[in-house]
């Protein structure tokens, strides 16, 4: 099945501590989760690795978020939108359900 949310899409968070924030999808994981730029930041306690010359300390990084907790952001309407699929010229393309505009 084709993914409704893909890498480099702009999404908006629907639920959780980051509700309403927008960001760009950095990575889509096979477990039904995505990593979004600047969203769901967690602090990780990193051990130093002298062999790689990496210092230790507390590092802030993005954690994965469930795909069901985000929606694609429609720049035309300025709101979260649902995604559908259709065939155009023999190719399967994604489109916004609110205004039927093709995505990328």
UniProtKB/Swiss-Prot annotation:
SMART domains: KOW. GO terms for molecular function: rRNA binding; structural constituent of ribosome. The keyword Translocase does not apply. GO terms for biological process: translation. The keyword Cell division does not apply. SUPFAM superfamilies: Translation proteins SH3-like domain. Keywords: Ribonucleoprotein, Ribosomal protein, RNA-binding, rRNA-binding. GO terms for cellular component: cytosol; ribonucleoprotein complex; ribosome. PROSITE patterns: RIBOSOMAL_L24 (PS01108). Disulfide bonds: none annotated. Pfam families: KOW, ribosomal_L24. It comes from the Bacteria. InterPro entries: KOW (IPR005824), Rib_uL2_dom2 (IPR014722), Ribosomal_uL24 (IPR003256), Ribosomal_uL24_CS (IPR005825), Ribosomal_uL24_KOW (IPR041988), Translation_prot_SH3-like_sf (IPR008991). Transmembrane segments: none annotated. Part of the 50S ribosomal subunit. One of two assembly initiator proteins, it binds directly to the 5'-end of the 23S rRNA, where it nucleates assembly of the 50S subunit. One of the proteins that surrounds the polypeptide exit tunnel on the outside of the subunit. Belongs to the universal ribosomal protein uL24 family. PANTHER family: MITOCHONDRIAL RIBOSOMAL PROTEIN L24 (PTHR12903). This is Large ribosomal subunit protein uL24. It comes from Enterobacter sp. (strain 638).
């Amino acid at each position: 099945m084709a993914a409704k949310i893909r890498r480099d899409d702009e999404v908006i968070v629907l639920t959780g501590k980051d509700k309403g924030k927008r960001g760009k999808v950095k990575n889509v994981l096979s477990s039904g989760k995505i990593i979004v730029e600047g969203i769901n930041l967690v602090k990780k306690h990193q051990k130093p690795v002298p062999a790689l010359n990496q210092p230790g300390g507390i590092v802030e990084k993005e954690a994965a978020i469930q795909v069901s907790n985000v929606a694609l952001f429609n720049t035309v309407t300025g709101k979260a939108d649902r995604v559908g699929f259709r065939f155009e010229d023999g190719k399967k393309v994604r489109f916004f359900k609110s205004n039927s505009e093709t995505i990328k």
